[in-house]
Structures are given as structure tokens and as C-alpha cells.
């Protein structure tokens, strides 16, 4: 919102990368013992995080809205797109993340995936609305899902498979929390920009230019910031075999050794299933069932993100410190249910905001 068979494809194209060899530089720092988390790396990580979250928010919400508004109002099309891209992203994260662990190039093991991933991510975000040009409608739906699936593959490879692993590579226990926390802020900033401002942008320039702008931002930031990331060049041969490393993750012995962790993952999966049942349809619901304009829909969501997401983050953190994680997590489930119930039966803007605040404020708890 998190690397993939496109692994063979990446390996095939790594050799012809001479067209941007000058772009991805192998600096002396990469071979030295100097800290990798320099100021330029910090800035690059923040910008890559922001660009990724902007593009993800657009894909997660406005691809669906565009499909409904401009290709077909059949919600089945949106459901298929959400389901297929979720599977693609999951497979991509696992397979391409493992592949990046084993990659050895003069540019590092993570940067090629981040560079290529952000490039394709941005280009396909910009190209997505072209699906509406295809007729009949079934072909347009197919092209939209195809674009989104390819985009999701490269996006998950770049962000979840490679960038997340890169952050682990270049941080330590003493500074990892700050980096992750800063990237979390970038996520909320991106949410505020997209969910709060997208309606205004779309109203002013239309869907097509909206996608062109967001896609352009992701592409440019990927092209500029990825070469600024510093990475130690590894020459040792990767241990074990590729598919064996993936299989080891799902062995029964691994489940037994990490029992509590997998219980947590199962709980989180069930919780996120509930979230993703409704969240991809949020803007569609506000526009087509509550009958709010696209600007008013954006304002409702933007206010809730500003207050319930960004504003409530610190107080909830204090609450977690005082009560502990488990009580706050249980409270969040209860308030989520209440908030969604209020949201689903409300037709007035104040009640919609109240309901959304209840489920949004504790969604990160």
C-alpha cells in the first residue's frame, strides 16, 4: 500500500541497463564503512515514500472510481480488479523480495528493483485512464485490470519487496524507529493530499490529467532519488536455492517457532479483510449513494484524515503506552464496528465525518 516471475525478466534486462549506468552511480561510499543513512539518503527515502504512497492511494481508490465512472458502473468489475491485483501484489512481494536478497549487481541488490519498479509504476499510473478508450466495455475492463495488475506487480516489487528491505539494510535498531515513523508521516501526508485534494484536482483538470500528474511525480522521484540511495556492493554467493528460501518461509517448523507472530498475522489478516471489503468503494459510495459531489467527498475524507489520522496519532500512541497494545487493539475493533455502522446509515456530512473519525482514528492502533 510490501518481490516477483518477473525476476527472470529483471535479470534479463539488468545487462542492457547501460542507458542509465550514469544515473545509478556506484560511489566510493558503497565500498567503505561509512554510514549509509546519510542526509541525502534520508531525503530520498522520504520522497520515495511520499511518491509511493501518493501513487498507491490513487491506485487503491481512484482507479476504482474511474472504472465505475468512465468504463462501467458494474461493481463486479471493481471487485475483480481489487481481487486480482491483491493476489499479484502478494505474490510479487514474496517472490521479488526473495530475489532482491539474492541479486548481486554493481548497482546493489535493491536499487535496480526500486528504479525499474518506480519507473513502470509511474508510467502505468499515467496510462491507466487510456483503458476507457477501448470498446466494447468488456475489453476496456480487461485492459484496466491488465494495467493495474502489471502496475501492482512492479509497485509491490519496488516498495514492499525492495525498498522495505533496503530500509532494514541501512538502518540499525537505534534509528529504524525514526525512519519508519517518518515514512508513516509521509503516508498520512499522501492520504491527505489524495483523499483531501483529488476531488479539487479532478474537478479542475479532469481524470486524465490527474493520473498524468500523479504518474509523473512517481516516475520523476523514482528516477532522481533511487540513484541517491547508497548501498553496499555484495559479492558473496547467495546461500541456498531461490525456491527453497521461499519454501522455508511456509514450513510447519517455521510456524511452530513463530507461533505468536503467526497468530498476530492471522488476526491482522482478518481485520484487514474487513477493511478491504469497504475501503476500495469509499469514494464510489460517497459520490453515487450518498450523492456528494467529488469535491465534497474529498473534503469529508480529507477532514477525517487530518483529524482522525494525523491528529489522533500521537494521543493514541500515548494511550498505547498507558494501557498497553492489547487493550487499545480490542478497543479499536469495537470502535471500528461502531464507526462503520454510523457511517453506513448516515446521509448528512456531520454524521458521515463522525462515523469515519471513529473507524479511522484507531485503524492504525
Where are these regions (language model features)?
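Hydrophobic core of transmembrane alpha-helices in multi-pass small-molecule transporters
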Residues: 124, 131, 137-158, 351-365
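Helix-to-loop junctions at the C-terminal end of transmembrane segments
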Residues: 93-106, 311-324
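Structural signature of the two symmetry-related core transmembrane helices
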Residues: 111-127, 327-342
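Glycine-rich segments within core transmembrane alpha-helices of 12-TM secondary carriers
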Residues: 89, 177-202
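C-terminal transmembrane helical hairpin of 12-TM major facilitator-type secondary transporters
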Residues: 326-365
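Pair of pore-lining "gating" transmembrane helices in MFS-fold secondary transporters
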Residues: 35-65, 258-278, 357
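Juxtamembrane intracellular "pre-TM" segments in multi-pass secondary transporters
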Residues: 26-38, 235-265
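Short amphipathic helix-loop junctions that connect adjacent transmembrane helices
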Residues: 61-77, 280-296
Amino acid at each position: 500500500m510490501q518481490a516477483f516471475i518477473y525476476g527472470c525478466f529483471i535479470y534479463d534486462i539488468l545487462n542492457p541497463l547501460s542507458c542509465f549506468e550514469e544515473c545509478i552511480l556506484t560511489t566510493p561510499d558503497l565500498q567503505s564503512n561509512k554510514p549509509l543513512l546519510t542526509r541525502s539518503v534520508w531525503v530520498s527515502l522520504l520522497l520515495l515514500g511520499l511518491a509511493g504512497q501518493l501513487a498507491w492511494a490513487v491506485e487503491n481508490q481512484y482507479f476504482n472510481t474511474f472504472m465505475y465512472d468512465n468504463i462501467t458502473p458494474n461493481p463486479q468489475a471493481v471487485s475483480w480488479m481489487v481481487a486480482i491485483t491483491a493476489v499479484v501484489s502478494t505474490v510479487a512481494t514474496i517472490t521479488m523480495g526473495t530475489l532482491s536478497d539474492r541479486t548481486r549487481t554493481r548497482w546493489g541488490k535493491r536499487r535496480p528493483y526500486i528504479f525499474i519498479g518506480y519507473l513502470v509504476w509511474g508510467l502505468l499510473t499515467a496510462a491507466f485512464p487510456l483503458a476507457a478508450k477501448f470498446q466494447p466495455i468488456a475489453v476496456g475492463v480487461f485492459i484496466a485490470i491488465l494495467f493495474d495488475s502489471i502496475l501492482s506487480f512492479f509497485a509491490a516489487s519496488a516498495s514492499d519487496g525492495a525498498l522495505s528491505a533496503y530500509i532494514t539494510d541501512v538502518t540499525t535498531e537505534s534509528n529504524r524507529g525514526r525512519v519508519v515513523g517518518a515514512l508513516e508521516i509521509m503516508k498520512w501526508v499522501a492520504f491527505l493530499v489524495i483523499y483531501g485534494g483529488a476531488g479539487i484536482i479532478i474537478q479542475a483538470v479532469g481524470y486524465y490529467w490527474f493520473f498524468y500528474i500523479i504518474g509523473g511525480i512517481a516516475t520523476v522521484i523514482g528516477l532522481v532519488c533511487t540513484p541517491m540511495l547508497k548501498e553496499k556492493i555484495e559479492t558473496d554467493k547467495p546461500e541456498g536455492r531461490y525456491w527453497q528460501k521461499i519454501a522455508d518461509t511456509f514450513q510447519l517448523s517455521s510456524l511452530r517457532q513463530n507461533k505468536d507472530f503467526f497468530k498476530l498475522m492471522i488476526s491482522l489478516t482478518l481485520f484487514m479483510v474487513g477493511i478491504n471489503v469497504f475501503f476500495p468503494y469509499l469514494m464510489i459510495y460517497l459520490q453515487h449513494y450518498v450523492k456528494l459531489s467529488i469535491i465534497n467527498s474529498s473534503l469529508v475524507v480529507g477532514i477525517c484524515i487530518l483529524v482522525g489520522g494525523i491528529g489522533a496519532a500521537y494521543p493514541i500512541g500515548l494511550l498505547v503506552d498507558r494501557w498497553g497494545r492489547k487493550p487499545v487493539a480490542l478497543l479499536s475493533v469495537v470502535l471500528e464496528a461502531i464507526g462503520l455502522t454510523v457511517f453506513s446509515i448516515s446521509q448528512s456530512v456531520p454524521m458521515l465525518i463522525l462515523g469515519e473519525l471513529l473507524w479511522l482514528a484507531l485503524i492504525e492502533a
